[in-house]
Amino acid sequence: MKLSPLKIDNLKASLPIIQGGMGVGISLSKLAGAVASCGGIGTISAAHPGYLEPDFETNPLEANIRALKHHVKEALKKAKDGLVAVNVMVASNDYEELVKASVESGANLIISGAGLPMSLPELCKGTATKIAPIVSSSKVCSLILKMWDKRHGATADAVVFEGPDAGGHLGFKLEDIDKSREGFYDEIGKIIESIKPYEEKYNKEIPLIVAGGIYSGKDIAKVLKLGAKGVQMGTRFVATNECDASEEFKMAYVNSTKEDIGLVKSPVGLPGRGIRNTFAKRIEVSNDPIRKCYNCIGKCPKKDIPYCISCSLIDSVKGETENSLVFCGSNAYKIDKIVPVKSLIEELVSEVEKE
């Protein structure tokens, strides 16, 4: 099977592979720029990109906005003619500011989930930045596109369907994960059908990008044959030389086993997937003291949470991978080495071409 370019409105990536946004600090300009320069779409996570800034503890919003703008511009430089996206979580208290900063910096695309991105069309109106909601089902996709059409007279430039095998927070209720996994491939066709009325109304193609558990070229080929136009992959890109995380974080993936990976407790009210390390097991039975609040998530029940997710993710990206939260996709245990981004992409393309 030969890979076709991924077209998102008037943008074109030579490869239909989006590197997923991973925070805190896992996918910044180094990784996103490398992926974009190889023909994919590199994605910067807007979740605390300024965690290394000197004023982050005292002025987290200013530090994050400054760092986000820096990383978008740096990634675009590295990308040459490639495309750079930013992943912004709707759940963030600073959602509007982060989207605007991404647009001002020249991001080609905003990918937005962890909630319904109802205001995204208005925030990007009149700019060259394209918009793509993350959805967990055809029902959610229909709801978002219907509301965008009704409220903003606009539609998506692409749609990302993220299945239950993804890493990080999942857009599913805990009791629905197994059922959603069983219906994952059938849901692709349903989402494509839910997009069609808006393609016709707005006279444009709205490509579906499939994410969640996509590991190999075989996986890529399977979803493309079902009608998807591209894939989004996060976990594979962690184990690359260019990934912005610490070597200790990358090696946590390399050293993981299938039994190590499972659902982990999160204070944001959604199930998450990661490595069930000492930390993950501990917080199931006791709470970690909250040493700092960054006021990052709107619905965070601060008095009742088992731990601060920002603090834990910052600890893990810096290398404390046994006593902090390490998110990963369901197939992370298959990774056995760290490779250059270019080599990984060449491997994936070669595998697809054999299908």
Language model features with spans:
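Active-site entrance/lid segments in N-terminal catalytic domains of soluble metabolic enzymes
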Residues: 1-201
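Residue-level detector of alpha-helix initiation sites
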Residues: 26, 214-215
